[in-house]
Regions:
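Surface-exposed patches in mature extracellular/periplasmic domains of secreted proteins
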Residues: 34-45, 123-127, 154, 240-244
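A conserved helix-loop-beta module that forms one wall/lid of the active-site cleft
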Residues: 14-49
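Short, conserved helix/loop micro-motifs enriched in His/Cys and acidic residues
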Residues: 1-23, 108-122
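Middle-to-C-terminal accessory/interaction subdomains
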Residues: 104, 108-149, 163-250
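Catalytic-loop signature of eukaryotic-like protein kinases
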Residues: 43, 145-157
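Internal "kinase-insert"/substrate-recognition segments embedded within catalytic cores
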Residues: 32-37, 49-138
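Active-site substrate-binding loop specific to GH73 endo-beta-N-acetylglucosaminidase modules
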Residues: 75-78, 82-86, 156, 165-170, ...
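Short, flexible loop/turn elements at secondary-structure junctions
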Residues: 13-17, 46-48, 55-61, 80, ...
């Protein structure tokens, strides 16, 4: 059975993910054509008791994918208890029993690919959708919600149509860290005392972002960077921001 078009979801106090910020970020991802979970607010009543306003957050399932006109595909995450700093991470799979029973060869291959991303010679352009990841990181720069850009937060959806991994945003936690004028591309600069201050708590996650910014041979990954800069320019335009906000001006 489904409620609000979802099979699984959780209730959270709005303060858990900084009130309306999380709501706006999820809808911003949908606004630019990225996969997103449902996240909205309700007045929650339990046994005739008014508990006030709660956030409803969708869990990861095929409904997320199919609602956005994509073919159902496996969604991966990292195991927080085994490490959160790339490359010292391990991956896990949502709906694991289903996928391993129905598509054992595919899942084995995908785990191999994801484990190989931790290796220096990994060809990220061959396995990750550069257009969608460029959009995603540009949105993180626009909003400063860098917690959602970390590998421990973002979920990896394998699109069987394109045979590429796409991001599904999660755990943005706006307000964590002070970044000033920092953007993700600044990780390409030589590290200094000032730059380490600018990247705040994501400094330790530099290697994750360099997987997209650089090729396996250390050269610039122009396929990604070109798209990323184009989206930075587009999303930072006042008209883009105003058009988005008008949709949610209630």
């Amino acid at each position: 059975k489904r409620l609000w078009g979802m099979e699984e979801f959780s209730f959270q106090k709005p303060i858990t993910k900084n009130y309306t910020y999380e709501y706006l970020f999820h809808n911003l991802l949908g606004h630019v054509g990225l996969a997103k979970v449902k996240y909205f607010f309700i007045n929650l009543h339990l046994n005739d008791q008014d508990l006030g306003v709660y956030a409803v957050e969708e869990s990861f399932s095929k409904e997320i994918i199919e609602r956005q006109n994509r073919r159902n595909g496996p969604i991966f995450s990292t195991k927080d208890e085994l490490g959160e700093y790339f490359p010292n991470i391990a991956f896990e799979l949502y709906s694991e029993s289903y996928w391993k029973n129905q598509y054992p060869k595919l899942i084995s291959d995908l785990f191999s690919i994801l484990n190989n991303i931790k290796m220096a010679k990994f060809h990220v352009n061959d396995y990750f959708d550069m257009d969608k990841w460029a959009k995603y990181f540009a949105i993180m720069d626009l909003t400063g919600a860098y917690h959602g850009a970390l590998i421990k937060s973002v979920k990896l959806y394998y699109n069987p149509t394109t045979a590429l991994f796409e991001p599904i945003g999660y755990d943005f936690h706006k307000g964590a860290g002070i970044f000033g004028g920092f953007i993700i591309m600044d990780f390409l600069q030589e590290e200094t005392k000032d730059s380490k201050t600018a990247c705040s708590f994501i400094c330790g996650h530099k290697e994750w972002f360099l997987r997209f910014l650089e090729k396996e041979n250390g050269e610039l990954n122009n396929k990604f960077i070109k798209k990323y800069i184009e989206y930075l320019i587009e999303y930072s335009d006042e008209d883009f921001v105003n058009n988005f906000l008008k949709k949610y001006d209630k």
